[in-house]
Amino acid sequence: MENNRKIISKNNINVQVFLVRSLIGKLNKKVKVLKALGLNKIGDKKVHFLNESIKGMLNETINMILLSEVM
């Protein structure tokens, strides 16, 4: 999770978001945020440009995702 925080602190980069935890039993708010990011089930991956709105969404669901920087 610490690596996720370092990546979120950067600006104007592309990040790959990987869903590693299930949506079952999670708060409805977190489920909606993950679906807005395009992550519906475990193992889904999406690439997003890291701006302020995406940063807020990633911070909301930081414990359920893994981030990696895409060149």
Swiss-Prot record:
GO terms for molecular function: structural constituent of ribosome. GO terms for cellular component: large ribosomal subunit. GO terms for biological process: translation. Keywords: Ribonucleoprotein, Ribosomal protein. Gene3D superfamilies: Ribosomal protein L30, ferredoxin-like fold domain. The keyword Ribonucleoprotein applies. Pfam families: Ribosomal_L30. InterPro entries: Ribo_uL30_ferredoxin-like_sf, Ribosomal_uL30_bac-type, Ribosomal_uL30_ferredoxin-like. Part of the 50S ribosomal subunit. Belongs to the universal ribosomal protein uL30 family. NCBIfam families: rpmD_bact. HAMAP family: Ribosomal_uL30_B. This is Large ribosomal subunit protein uL30. The gene is rpmD.
